[in-house]
Design a protein with these regions (language model features):
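Outer-membrane beta-barrel proteins
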Residues: 1-315
Length: 315
């Protein structure tokens, strides 16, 4: 009996050690709003933040090294369908190694320029009817890469990231004759106290397209001030230039979001957008929000206004 108890104790200890060395997490969010988008006359339910279900994992390999993975499915909660007809793991699907050297990921992921710079400057985080992030993307930048490699590392307040993927495919992984080079992007960010500064440069893979983005944030009491600019050329060899100014102001459980962005493509002002919004936290994971966006550029003359009233639950 004592031997059986001892054996059970040893097995339990080994099982506990194994589970401590490996972990899998499940997360995501569901978001739905009533409203309309700038440039569209359609009113109804929609999901601008991108409802998602994701899985992530980490296995300790010893010596300070770990195997990591991440997969994310995007879906439309109003219909229950996938947002992509071709990619089930449309958000990302990567596997990699992490250690003292940094992190290497292989597969499909966000570009360094997008996730580390362009998305960080928008006070709306690219979500809702008032989102301003599109100005910094300037019709040039890609949100994701496919069939690629990504490396990133952080040393103190300095973070660096670089990704490169196969030429001849777009950011969904499908064949695309306009992508003649190997798409790549790189970013450097620096954070010290209330100050955050960022730089990125990228070539999304076309013969002529390239884009440089600068970003800054400054925390001041309950407010975070944001600024960004992008400059480059698109694949038609037209110059693009954009500016963004924004702020988030925290008031108790509420978050006031506001900003303004412009984009000029060649000689045409293709975006002049104002966004204002209010998000209210019902709990740590659930919030309600209201957002208004208006674009005075000629391209949106017929439908210059967008708005949404929604609820978001994170899990």
């Amino acid at each position: 009996m004592k031997k059986s108890l001892l054996a059970l104790a040893v097995l339990t200890a080994f099982a506990g050690a194994a589970s401590a060395q490996s972990s899998v997490t499940i997360g995501g969010k569901i978001d739905l709003a009533v409203g309309k988008l700038i440039g569209s006359a359609d009113k109804g339910l929609f999901d601008t933040p991108g409802s998602r279900l994701n899985f992530g994992g980490r296995e300790d390999l010893g010596g300070g090294m770990a195997a990591v993975f991440g997969i994310e499915h995007r879906f439309s909660p109003d219909t229950g369908t996938s947002t992509s007809a071709t990619n089930f793991w449309n958000g990302y699907s990567w596997v990699g190694l992490n250690g003292g050297f940094g992190t290497v990921r292989l597969g499909r992921d966000y570009t360094s320029a997008f996730i580390n710079v362009q998305n960080q400057v928008d006070p709306f985080g690219g979500d809702n009817a008032g989102a301003l992030r599109a100005a910094l993307l300037a019709g040039v930048a890609k949100v994701r890469f496919a069939n690629g490699v990504k490396y990133f590392n952080t040393m103190g307040g300095l973070s660096m990231s670089y990704d490169i993927s196969e030429g001849g495919v777009n950011n969904t992984g499908a064949a695309d004759a306009t992508v003649v080079n190997k798409p790549w992007s790189g970013s450097v960010t620096y954070a010290a106290g209330p100050v955050w500064l960022a730089f990125s440069h990228e070539n999304p893979g076309g013969k002529n397209d390239k884009l440089t983005t600068l970003g800054a944030r400054f925390a001041m009491g309950p407010a975070v001030l944001r600024a960004g600019m992008s400059n480059g050329t698109n694949n038609a060899n037209a110059k693009v230039k954009s500016y963004l100014l924004g702020a988030n102001i925290r008031m108790g459980a509420g978050d006031i979001r506001l900003g303004y962005a412009t984009l000029k493509t060649g000689s045409v002002t293709s975006m002049k957008r104002l966004g204002v919004g209010y998000h209210y936290d019902l709990s740590k994971r659930t919030k309600v929000y209201a957002t208004l966006g208006r674009d005075s550029a000629t391209a949106f003359k017929a439908e210059p206004t967008g708005f949404d009233f929604g609820i978001q639950h994170n899990f």
